[in-house]
């Protein structure tokens, strides 16, 4: 993502605090002074989770399968994902009527379009996406930080990305230097979770990938767990040491 920035690092920064393991080789290659400190989300999301209490707090069923839907954090994302997600929800509920589908949004104003029309048939929860991810069996997630959160929580997921033609053209041709868009796949450099992009983002395709992911749930969760471990640094105070090193100069 925006690879060209690395050429400016030495002139702009005394030291880079790296959050992801794959950044190390890149920074070494260009002679950048850095310390790998791990990702703060890996630690903050690593505590024990009381599923029963959390489900009760969220008003969710204790025994039903839970599918989480995270359509994005921006209105433009939600608009592009609105119809395919709506089509997926209708099909999944028809085939699996006992499943509880939870739509996690940042704020009430994000509830729009066809998803709003479905709000009577699904559970809509605001400003609690991490909690929803913590208790779900699988998530359908718009690409972004939420894919990392779901990965750290070892939750199987299907990642979707749909934007307008110009945005996708610029992203694909000028900024993105990896074949993956989901952070768990980027971190592992293999396709652990399904990614659907642009014309692939349709209800039928999402449904198909969700079914396949649920069948392979255990294997996916184990691979995601290993990614979380790679984001946890062995020294709990490594971040503090890196900061002290900078200010001691």
Regions found by a protein language model. Give the residues of each.
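Nucleotide-activated sugar donor-binding and catalytic core shared by glycosyltransferases
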Residues: 1-249
């Amino acid at each position: 993502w925006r690879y060209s920035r690395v050429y400016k690092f030495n002139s702009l920064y005394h030291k880079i605090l790296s959050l992801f393991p794959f950044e190390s080789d890149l920074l070494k290659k260009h002679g950048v002074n850095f310390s790998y400190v791990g990702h703060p989300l890996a630690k903050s999301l690593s505590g024990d989770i009381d599923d029963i209490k959390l489900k009760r707090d969220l008003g969710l069923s204790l025994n039903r399968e839970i599918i989480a839907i995270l359509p994005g954090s921006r209105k433009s994302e939600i608009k592009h994902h609105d119809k395919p997600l709506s089509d997926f929800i209708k099909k999944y509920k028809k085939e699996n009527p006992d499943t509880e589908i939870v739509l996690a949004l940042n704020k009430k104003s994000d509830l729009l379009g066809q998803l709003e029309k479905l709000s009577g048939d699904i559970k809509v929860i605001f400003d609690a996406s991490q909690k929803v991810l913590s208790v779900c069996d699988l998530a359908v997630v718009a690409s972004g930080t939420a894919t990392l959160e779901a990965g750290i929580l070892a939750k199987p997921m299907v990642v979707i990305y749909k934007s307008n033609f110009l945005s996708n053209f610029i992203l694909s041709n000028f900024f993105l230097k990896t074949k993956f868009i989901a952070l768990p796949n980027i971190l592992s450099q293999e396709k652990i979770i399904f990614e659907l992009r642009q014309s692939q983002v349709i209800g039928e395709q999402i449904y198909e990938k969700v079914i396949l992911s649920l069948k392979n749930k255990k294997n996916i969760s184990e691979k995601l767990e290993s990614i979380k471990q790679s984001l946890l640094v062995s020294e709990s105070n490594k971040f503090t040491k890196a900061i002290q090193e900078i200010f001691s100069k």
